[in-house]
Amino acid sequence: MKKVNTEAVVRNSFKKLRCRIRALVRNTSSNLVHDFRTEIKKLKAILNLFSTELKDPEDLKLPRRLKDIYRAAGSIRELQLQLSQTKRYKEYSALLIEVQTDREEHFRRIAQKKTIKKTRQRIMERLPGQLHQHTITLFRENKLKEIETIRALPQPSDDQMHTIRKNLKDIIYVQKIGDEKSIENPAVKEMKQATKELGKLNDLRTSIKYLRPVWINEIGYVERRKLVRLRTVRTRRKDALKKRIISEYPGFQFTRVSEE
């Protein structure tokens, strides 16, 4: 295993994060929101990995303020996805756009440079001096174990399916830290494909959330009926996709990453 400079890894992650936030404050396009959230997920996975080298793993938890910024961006992303699929419903789209505008203003208020700088300083002071190969192996195996536990359930919930996706993503994010060549491992490629399918499942779940009564009750009768039908269709599609994912990836054995 190559020697890992933990400070350099985290410093580079925060550098990218600052650039993402700076761009997002100016323009909350769907691509920029996605890039920012991906960078946060990578940082969180890295910190979780490094924390296993410490006596108190809580020292490297993602700070609350950074979580708040991440969630604010996520709430914008959800509406962007929903709007891209429901443009023909005029009243509904107008409602979502109004909410999205409020959420974008909230994001700009909390996405302050000082928050990122203070967060980085706090984390840099608590990083472990070195990272061992067995730490990466243990991190990965714990993620896989949780996946297998969920997969063994008769009917995994939507939340549990999302946990599988997050675990697979975490494995992918940290795998390159241990060995850059491992990112080409066929198992990792299969994991990426699985996360795409699980991402589609989560997108359907999110869409259904924004079609619940609390979001459409104030819409006119004709359009509301169409939205109710759309919710039914997407619920059926979600359930069918979940079954297909489970059947196509029995046991999620493909997630076993080579130690070579």
Model segments located where?
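Function-determining surface determinants
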Residues: M1-E260
